[in-house]
């Protein structure tokens, strides 16, 4: 009796793209952490079917604090929601040790702007057509800061899906894909230096 042939390992590129498409096809809810006043506080924004709810300060039932942006990020990872937009931190002193510790959060400003526009939220003023900047950043190879050794195939796959969604006029889905790619791979969507 011959041994069964080993099952092929799943294609990580196809898996990530499928996960992204699933997230934007039926976004049950999503969470954004934000520091709205530069005082190291955080607010979680949850939306489902267009409804936006806010929760800030204190802790969640799972014990992850929402009073800091680091805690907000931990909450997003713990809850494992289908779409995570990111954290936007703004501080008066960009050279302070605290600011340096949350550099990945500070770089997510465009992600927060995009999420506001995506949810038609007025929680924070959003620059006109912020989604275009997000997609442009996603498409520009010199803006990618992924630690993966080979993100080219994934970038190409996401770009193809983005193009298809935009061609169909589905900007919301394209937005979700852009945010998914940025969050999952750690791409820098912040302003150019």
Predicted features, each with a name:
Residues 2-193:
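Phosphate- and other anionic-substrate recognition elements at nucleic-acid/protein interfaces
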């Amino acid at each position: 009796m011959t041994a069964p042939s080993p099952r092929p390992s799943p294609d990580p590129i196809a898996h990530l793209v499928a996960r992204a498409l699933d997230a934007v096809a039926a976004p049950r809810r999503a969470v954004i952490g934000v520091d709205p006043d530069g005082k190291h506080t955080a607010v979680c924004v949850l939306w489902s079917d267009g409804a936006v709810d806010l929760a800030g300060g204190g802790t969640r039932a799972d014990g992850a604090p929402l009073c800091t942006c680091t805690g907000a990020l931990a909450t997003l990872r713990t809850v494992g929601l289908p779409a995570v937009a990111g954290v936007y931190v703004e501080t008066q002193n960009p050279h302070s040790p605290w600011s340096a510790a949350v550099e990945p959060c500070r770089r997510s400003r465009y992600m927060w702007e995009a999420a506001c526009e995506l949810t038609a939220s007025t929680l924070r003023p959003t620059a006109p057509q912020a989604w275009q900047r997000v997609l442009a950043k996603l498409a520009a190879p010199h803006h990618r800061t992924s630690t993966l050794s080979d993100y080219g195939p994934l970038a190409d796959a996401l770009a193809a899906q983005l193009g298809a969604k935009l061609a169909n006029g589905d900007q919301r889905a394209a937005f979700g894909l852009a945010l998914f790619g940025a969050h999952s791979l750690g791409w820098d969507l912040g302003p150019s230096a």
